[in-house]
Amino acid sequence: MNVILLDKIANLGNLGDQVVVKAGYARNYLLPQGKAVVANESNVKVFEARRAELEAKLAAELAAANQRAEKITALEAVVIASKAGDEGKLFGSVGNRDIADAVTAAGVELAKSEVRLPLGALRTTGDFEVEVQLHTEVKAVVKVSIVAEA
């Protein structure tokens, strides 16, 4: 299926690119999320008329993400207290939601879907650097310190 992208999508293309994707990916993800439109003559004309508006919106989102990244980088270590055993092993784990809630409590809005833990949840006490992806082009690192509850 041939579609016109309305947003930058990783491993696919930028705003305004006409790309060929599998029909299921287009119908189930790109079209319902508003990230693309079917590339027919009328949609191409409508897109060209709205191109400047969409580029301005994309630039505003990028600027907002950069501001949030600066705030996150400026944060000192976010402390999360969790129950732990004698050797520093946690009873349970610290996951995306816990980190997002702690950063939000520290004053910077963060959604759990923006937290990246490629090795899974954190299961020991200590200091960690967690990557946060705020936009397709903007990443930041949050310092997380997990301490045992008294």
UniProtKB/Swiss-Prot annotation:
Keyword presence, RNA-binding: yes
Any one biological process term the GO annotation gives: translation
InterPro entries for the chain: Ribosomal_bL9, Ribosomal_bL9/RNase_H1_N, Ribosomal_bL9_bac/chp, Ribosomal_bL9_C, Ribosomal_bL9_C_sf, Ribosomal_bL9_N, Ribosomal_bL9_N_sf
Any one annotated GO CC term: ribosome
Keyword field: Ribonucleoprotein, Ribosomal protein, RNA-binding, rRNA-binding
The organism's place on the tree of life at top rank: Bacteria
Gene3D superfamilies, sorted: Ribosomal protein L9, C-terminal domain (3.10.430.100), Ribosomal protein L9, N-terminal domain (3.40.5.10)
GO function terms (MF aspect): rRNA binding; structural constituent of ribosome
Family affiliation: Belongs to the bacterial ribosomal protein bL9 family.
Function of the protein: Binds to the 23S rRNA.
Name the record gives this protein: Large ribosomal subunit protein bL9
Species this chain originates from: Shewanella sp. (strain W3-18-1)
Lineage: Bacteria, Pseudomonadati, Pseudomonadota, Gammaproteobacteria, Alteromonadales
Name of encoding gene: rplI
